[in-house]
């Protein structure tokens, strides 16, 4: 993060999200040690606070735009003519929040029609197709990346920035059940409340509709006194009651002061509990427009069996939920298996009913199904780029049509191939397809939108294929593309293979292997995963060099389903699909076993002297720290991103030493760590080794090297019964300046200046290590952003135990606490200097407890020991 973005995030109140964990990550980091700590005082620890932090400023006002008109039932495409565009939602936010109109750092988006023709900085590709549209909602024009928008910067210039798709999300907290509670909204990277001034049932109804808890809401109020430290974002919310999202309502940005009656907005979502309109919801989808159908009956939620489930049934579900667009039925627990009872079976709607209760069906609770047959629906909004097959006997066949600028249009068949058909059918949720004669279906009278389409077969969406500009063609409707799609045979094997991608690697040639099957990206289990399997993956991706397999979630754990297990390639197959012998979806794995590959692998290990001259004179240099997707605040670090991070390991008789403490590489032969790391096992050099270049503790890597210890120097003032002077130096075995071999993954950290005050000079601070994540010991190097705290703050909490040779750091906000528990004892607290060099300002030392409220972690202040370090190491 640049200094400018850091300051901007601070001003907008987003700092807790920038420098800390979110609530999920906070659950995954609690302890510092990878193994049980030695006897003695526990470290680090926490204390409660009695000081209220200043309230963060709310985000700037959001521009208002009229809500798009809701389609009436008569205007809705009939289920037999409608297709489906699978997840993620085209062009918009993957979370389904289509109305986000502010960047992730709080800048209001410009309307796409207001963007000038000349820009100082090139935006992502394909944005020109949005030029002229009068809305300002965040979009991903190519359909593959993260949504973004243009905004006006402080200099009056137009720039672009990514959007946070969670902005405008709502939740109910503190109620007796899921249908009631205080309204909390997500903005500027954190959850906040709404002042209850002018809060009425129309506002409450929009909240209930957005949460899929029915269309009727009752406005309530909650005292702020019981909510803890949480900001107020909005006041005077003024909804009509039919908006799809609270972002579309008029409202005022909270400017501080006192909220009338000191009450926060709350709601109770009320359903009509008569027989005509049972309570329904969609669960397990990637947006509010899709998911497993669940009904609330007799006091509990249950599912619907998919026997005879079709698009007509889906049409009724979408109508009952108030969702317009294209309705499609999904079978065989496509959105995951539910729990609880199966409520209904044999549902047979005509598509014209107002409620599923009006459809012919089994009696409540009567069925012959399991949850593997749970029914689902998708209600795809009509946005530009949605496709369908129209004019056939069902949604699986017909004339290919694309929705653009409020109108359905066709596609010309010039240059149409089998690969094009495959991409269309896959996007619509089918396994196979073939081009059909246009004479089989009624001729269109609308526009011809696309021509000269060419797909490679790897695309996940039809609009990712190359094509002419919208409306440019030399065709007539006699040349309209028509397609018939088929679900495929048992086992879901594909004749053409399926798309493969590599995720979270350092470059495009390596990463976690993900495959696109059944409309979803998923991973491969590493059972039996070998270099032969990796060779096939790399060949399918177009790489011809040597390939190496990586196991045990080497590139991080994926999300979504695990599609494939027990891959058995010979190494000569043309695609992964030719290697699969086991049915898709069958496995006995977790995401901790996700498979990965490195393509064009030629062995990157540097020799001992090859780069000595170029690297021995530098420090604090991160050669591998940027990637498109930032991973901060307690997640896996980028491999090689912290090249000075090393581990002090305890040797065993078996030769497989375990991790004891973290440490920091200061030069080729010297390592900095904590003195207490040697308290239990003594300071005999025979007991220890130091590992450099490590990332995944269980996978041997090309830059990894384990070096013996020649000398251990503990500060002479350190006492085992005290936490002061908790610092030590370790001399590695080897000739002078030739102990550890430098490379892009092994480099020394800089030392701070003597008596430097890091609270004034340092910024952008991180802790790193392989510490206990709270659920299991981390296999991969972790990192967490962490703020330095004022000296007086630490002295008040630790009284006389905190000395001038110590620092304390941590995020003390509730649910976002971060301290040295997230690193290893002896590990580094690194801060960025001006000019992008990094210095070690702290050594993880002690604290009160772990994750305890208002008790920051304590670190040995390295700047206080610079003369001692230099006298020992001769640096």
From Swiss-Prot:
The answer to keyword Glycoprotein applying to this record is: yes
Give the Kringle domain ranges: 93-165
Task: Give the location in the cell.
Answer: Secreted
Region Disordered: start and end of each range?
30-87
For the region Zymogen activation region, give the residue spans. 619-630
GO cellular component terms attached to this protein's record: axon; dendrite; plasma membrane; synaptic cleft; terminal bouton
Quote the catalytic residue positions.
676 (charge relay system), 726 (charge relay system), 825 (charge relay system)
Provide the SRCR domain boundaries: 170-271, 280-381, 387-487, 500-601
- This chain belongs to which protein, by name? Neurotrypsin
Which species expresses this protein natively? Macaca mulatta (Rhesus macaque)
Domain Peptidase S1, residue spans: 631-874
Q: Please indicate which residues carry the site annotation Reactive bond homolog.
A: 630-631
């Amino acid at each position: 993060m640049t200094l400018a973005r850091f300051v901007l995030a601070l001003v907008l109140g987003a700092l807790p999200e920038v420098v800390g964990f979110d609530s999920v990550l906070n659950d995954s980091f609690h302890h510092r040690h990878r193994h049980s700590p030695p006897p003695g005082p526990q470290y680090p620890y926490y204390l409660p606070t009695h000081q209220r932090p200043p309230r963060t400023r709310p985000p700037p006002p959001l521009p208002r735009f009229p809500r798009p008109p809701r389609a009436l039932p008569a205007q809705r495409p009939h289920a037999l003519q409608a297709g489906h565009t699978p997840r993620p939602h085209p062009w918009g936010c993957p979370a389904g929040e289509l109305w986000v109109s502010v960047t992730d750092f709080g800048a209001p988006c410009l309307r796409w029609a207001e963007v000038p023709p000349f820009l100082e900085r090139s935006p992502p590709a394909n944005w020109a197709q949005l030029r002229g549209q009068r809305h300002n909602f965040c979009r991903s024009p190519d359909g593959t990346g993260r949504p973004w928008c243009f905004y006006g910067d402080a200099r009056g210039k137009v720039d672009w920035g990514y959007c946070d798709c969670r902005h405008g999300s709502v939740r109910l907290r503190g109620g007796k059940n899921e249908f009631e509670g205080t309204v909390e909204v997500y903005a500027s990277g954190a959850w906040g409340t709404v002042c209850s001034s002018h809060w009425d049932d129309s506002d409450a109804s929009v909240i209930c509709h957005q949460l899929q808890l029915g269309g009727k809401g009752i406005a309530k109020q909650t005292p702020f006194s019981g909510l803890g430290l949480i900001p107020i974002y909005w006041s005077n919310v003024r909804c009509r009651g039919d908006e799809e999202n609270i972002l579309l309502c008029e409202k005022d940005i909270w400017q501080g002061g006192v909220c009338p009656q000191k009450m926060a907005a709350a709601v109770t979502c009320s359903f009509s509990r008569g027989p005509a309109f049972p309570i329904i919801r969609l669960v397990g989808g990637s947006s509010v427009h899709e998911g497993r159908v669940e009904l609330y009956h007799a006091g509990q939620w249950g599912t619907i069996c998919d026997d005879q489930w079709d698009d007509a049934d889906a049409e009724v579900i979408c109508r009952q939920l108030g969702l317009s667009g294209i309705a499609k039925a999904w079978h065989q627990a496509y959105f995951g298996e539910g729990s609880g009872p199966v409520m209904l079976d044999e549902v047979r709607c005509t598509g014209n009913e107002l409620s599923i209760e009006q459809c012919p069906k089994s009696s409540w609770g009567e069925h012959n199904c399991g949850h593997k047959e749970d029914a689902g629906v998708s209600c795809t909004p009509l946005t530009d780029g949605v496709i369908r097959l129209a004019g056939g006997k069902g949604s699986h066949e017909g004339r290919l049509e694309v929705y653009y600028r409020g109108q359905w249009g066709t596609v010309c068949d010039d240059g149409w191939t089998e690969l094009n058909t495959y991409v269309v059918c896959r996007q619509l949720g089918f396994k196979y397809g073939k081009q059909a004669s246009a004479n089989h279906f009624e001729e269109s009278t609308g526009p011809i939108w696309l021509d000269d389409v060419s797909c490679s077969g790897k695309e996940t969406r039809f609009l990712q294929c190359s094509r002419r500009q919208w409306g440019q063609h030399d065709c007539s409707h006699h040349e309209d593309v028509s397609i018939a799609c088929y679900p495929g045979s048992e086992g879901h094997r594909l004749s053409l293979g399926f798309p493969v991608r590599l995720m979270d690697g350092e470059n495009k040639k390596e990463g976690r292997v993900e495959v696109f099957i059944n409309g979803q990206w998923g991973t491969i289990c590493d059972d039996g995963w070998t270099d032969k399997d990796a060779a096939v993956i790399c060949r399918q991706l177009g790489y011809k060099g040597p390939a190496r397999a990586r196991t045990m979630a080497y590139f991080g754990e994926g999300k979504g389903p695990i599609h494939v297990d027990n891959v058995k390639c010979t190494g000569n197959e043309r695609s992964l699909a030719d290697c699969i012998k086991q049915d898709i979806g069958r496995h006995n794995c977790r995401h901790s076993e996700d498979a990965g590959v490195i393509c064009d692998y030629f062995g990157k290990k540097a020799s001992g002297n090859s780069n000595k001259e170029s690297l021995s004179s530098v420090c604090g240099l991160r050669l591998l720290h940027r990637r498109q997707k930032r991973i901060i605040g307690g997640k896996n670090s980028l491999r090689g991103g912290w090249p000075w991070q090393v581990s002090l390991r305890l040797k065993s008789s078996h030769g497989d030493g375990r991790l004891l403490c973290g440490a920091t590489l200061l030069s080729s032969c010297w390592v900095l760590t904590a003195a207490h790391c040697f308290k239990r096992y003594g300071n005999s050099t025979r007991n220890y080794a130091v590992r450099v270049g490590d990332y995944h503790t269980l996978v041997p890597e090309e830059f990894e090297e384990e070096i013996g210890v020649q000398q251990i120097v503990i500060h002479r003032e350190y006492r085992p019964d005290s936490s002061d002077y908790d610092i030590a130096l370790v001399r590695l075995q080897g000739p002078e300046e030739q102990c550890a071999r430098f490379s892009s993954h092994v480099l020394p950290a800089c030392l701070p200046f003597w008596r430097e005050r890091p609270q004034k000079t340092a910024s952008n601070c991180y802790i790193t290590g392989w510490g206990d994540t709270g659920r299991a010991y981390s296999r991969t190097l972790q990192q967490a952003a962490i703020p330095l705290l004022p000296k007086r703050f630490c002295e008040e909490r630790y009284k006389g135990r905190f000395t001038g040779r110590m620092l304390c750091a941590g995020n003390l906000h509730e649910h976002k606490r971060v301290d040295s528990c997230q690193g290893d004892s002896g590990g580094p607290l690194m801060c960025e200097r001006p000019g992008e060099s990094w210095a070690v300002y702290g050594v993880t030392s002690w604290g009160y407890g772990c994750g305890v409220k208002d008790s920051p972690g304590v670190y040995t202040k390295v700047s206080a020991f610079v003369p001692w370090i230099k006298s020992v190491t001769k640096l």
